[in-house]
Amino acid sequence: MGTLARALMRVVLDSNVLLSALISPHGSPDVIYRAWRAARFEIVTSTTQLDELRRASRYPKFKAVLLPHRVGAMVNNLQRALVLDRPPTDIEADDPFDAFLLAMAIASDADYLVTCDHRAGLLQRVHIGRTRIVTPVAFCAEAL
């Protein structure tokens, strides 16, 4: 017996993409977030990422640009996504804080991992398993 085909592509969004969607309402990260809200694809997240979003949104550099109620609404919305409780922990990344993103991509068999971070080495990997690692602009051009 074969497995059923997924109806929607699965996408892991780096926390920097999600925060960028809140900061700049007309950029490609916001286009991606709105496309997910319109059910154009499935977001994969984790309890680790939801905690990171809550924590990062309180950083002093974000206080002036992130409204707490918008961050709260995003976290609440993401709790309705595919939330992984404990992604694998044995994944290596150039930036150890990005390992959970790679783990989510592998555990969920995601189609894309979308990141804004050019310095951490995620984009240089190009893919992990079958998951393509791309910028928000590239994701919009390829998938939306």
Mark where each language-model region is:
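PIN-domain endoribonuclease scaffold, especially VapC-family toxins
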Residues: 34-89
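Short, hydrophobic alpha-helical packing/hinge segments within bilobed ligand-binding/sensory domains
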Residues: 32, 101-102
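Short, well-structured N-terminal submotif of metal-dependent ribonuclease cores
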Residues: 1-45
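Acidic, PIN/NYN-like endoribonuclease modules and their adjacent C-terminal/linker elements
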Residues: 91, 95, 99, 106-112, ...
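Short beta-strands and strand-loop turn motifs
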Residues: 13, 84-87, 115-116
